[in-house]
Swiss-Prot record:
Region (Disordered): 1-82
GO CC terms of this entry: Golgi apparatus; membrane; microtubule organizing center
rRNA processing as UniProt keyword: no
Keyword Transmembrane carried by entry: yes
Membrane topology label: Single-pass membrane protein
Keywords carried by this UniProt record: Cytoplasm, Cytoskeleton, Golgi apparatus, Membrane, Transmembrane, Transmembrane helix
Source species of the chain: Gallus gallus
Residue spans crossing the bilayer: 104-124
A Pfam family: Beta-prop_FAM234A_B
Recorded family membership: Belongs to the FAM234 family.
Subcellular location: Membrane; Golgi outpost; Cytoplasm, Cytoskeleton, Microtubule organizing center
Cross-referenced InterPro entries: FAM234, FAM234A_B_beta-prop, Quinoprotein_ADH-like_sf, WD40/YVTN_repeat-like_dom_sf
This protein's name: Protein FAM234B
Amino acid sequence: MATVLSRALKLPGKKSPDLGEYDPLTQADSDESEDDLVLNIQKNGGVKNGKSPPEEMQDPDSDVEVGMTKQHTSERAPEGYPAEAAGSLEQKAAPSLMPYLRTAVFLLTVVISMILVLVCAFLIPCPPRDLHNTWNHNLGQGAGGVLSPLELCDVNGDGLPDILIVFTALMNASVMGVSTPSVTVVALSGMNGSTLWSIQLPEETRSVQCKGLSLGSPAEPICLVTGTAKFLSLLSASTGKTIWTLNSIHLSDGILAAPAATLPDVDGDGIRDIVVLALKETQPDVFFVLVSGKTGAALGGPVKYNVIGEGKVIGPQVHITSRGAIYILFGFGNVQAIALRDIFTQARNRDSFPMMLHQEEPEWEKRRSVNLSELIDIYSGGVDFLQTIKAPDTNCSNLLITTKEGLILLQGQDLEPRWTLEIQNISSQPVLGYFSADQTLDFMLQAQTGNGKKKVVVVDGKSGLPVWKQELPWQKQQLDALSVMTLDKKSVFLFWADEAQPVLHSLHPGPRSERPGLHHLYLLHPVFPTVLLDLTNATDKVIASAVGINDLQKDAFHITVTTTATSEKQPGFLSVSKLGLKWAMMTQGRMVWLKDTTTPKISRGEVRRFLARLKFVDFPHKL
């Protein structure tokens, strides 16, 4: 009864405003009630750490009860500690370990990443840099010079093209000291000129081809060697070991007439195949043989044709039209075409053929009806060179035909002439490059003019008109010009000529010795058409040259093969040399002002600054 009366009249543990003193009985009762009340409030979430949730609205009674709880806690604080401090300790939450864990994980990740970077830096070697701007390699005594054009291919996987050269080496025999000829293929490092491997072949060769060939693994380069009689073999470019050799029984009644051509995969094994053109003992009978690129086995029998024509062997070349039709171009002083579908059906002696051979080119097929045969006449009379030229902004290629009298560009779709240029005595195959600013491939060609001189001409690929020409002295055998494309889609052109007479200005201080009878390598850039850059010279006879690209350093290098022999039949010592183009331009290049120029002369510093910014890249349309 006293407890009920106390609760009704006053708050527990506080002075009654009416009585002015504490009631002991009521105080004891209220202590027990307060404990129950505090437990109930905490269980229901009313108070947490001595505070109410801010989002909940409390009525006055609950405020009173919270106040009672705070007072009760203060009264039971341990001795030696202030009641206020004890309350604050209860209100503080225990510190969380998550921030420490996150910091530890972050630091551990950083440490592991740094360790991995350091390990990779020491274990993974950096690509080797080409520090050899020049080198010279003596091949020894050879007879007949170089047997086939130089081929550049990365043989040792260092990212720099290496040089494959075929020549007839004179080996010293043990009897009477007589030298015997031996056809040799040598792979030289493009980095320093060292010999990577060397093998002997059973016969002379027409070509060594390494581009566009693969046995499924891009990391394993391969090369196709075509002989002058019956030898056709696929070699590993890394070691020189033979992968397969065509059985000569397939050429029993003929010999190889030209380098082999690479086809799309026609037998369905995933590897590109090969077609060869063979010539019988009695021309004009020729025949084609399809060869598996994977095994070297013949894909069926020989396909024979009777052709009419006299002159230089043309092709075989593979031409794919805009519709996807595949034709083989070939000829003897002329250009003819035959559908690969026809060769395949006759070789396999069946009417079915792969889906890729179903396409036809209507405009080409119209020309078939003229002679009522499988042969399609493209061009007749005096053909020396045939090249396929990628047409800009299309998937079609045009045909560039070179004769003794000029150039003819045929449209690849309908074989109609696009333009014709008359120029006499063209002595070398035109080289492709970008001279004009219309992004159309232009052509540099060389023509003999008599009196120990030659004319070098650049022809605009769109109009067929000459856009640059110069007459220079040249007494020796004609060599093909070369071109290298730059990053801004221009091309520099390289060609050999004898000493030009205009005044020379060196790009590098200091004199360069000159001797009479030197052959000079000149560079022409379309930005400076009135200036030739004389890069280097040679006293021996230059018999072959090529250019390679260093993709890593955006640089290029020129390869020259010279011989001491004064005639083709006389043996002489062969030498291969390398010249870095950027290094040559900046250190020993000399400016040659053309005589007929009317434009103001350019300062040496301006040319030097421009050349220093040049970056060379691989030619995208090079076959």
